[in-house]
């Protein structure tokens, strides 16, 4: 599974974890993806969609 939203294309971003001593180490920020049956180009498919697309109704749920 690639960490990418099927609707908006949001994916992983890199950043730093900063400790109390201010030492930075690399980490990944990943989107909150949920598996969902959606209508994508008029076809019902099971895709991974980020929660911001679900909340804003960019992903139309297929029933």
Curated annotation (Swiss-Prot):
Keyword annotations of the record: Ribonucleoprotein, Ribosomal protein
UniProt KW Transcription keyword: no
Gene Ontology CC annotations of this record: ribonucleoprotein complex; ribosome
GO biological process: translation
SUPFAM superfamilies xrefs: L28p-like
Disulfide cysteine pairs (residue numbers): none
Record-linked InterPro entries: Bacterial_rp_bL28, Ribosomal_bL28, Ribosomal_bL28/bL31-like_sf, Ribosomal_bL28_bact-type, Ribosomal_bL28_sf
Keyword Ribonucleoprotein (UniProt): yes
Similarity field: Belongs to the bacterial ribosomal protein bL28 family.
Protein name, UniProt field: Large ribosomal subunit protein bL28
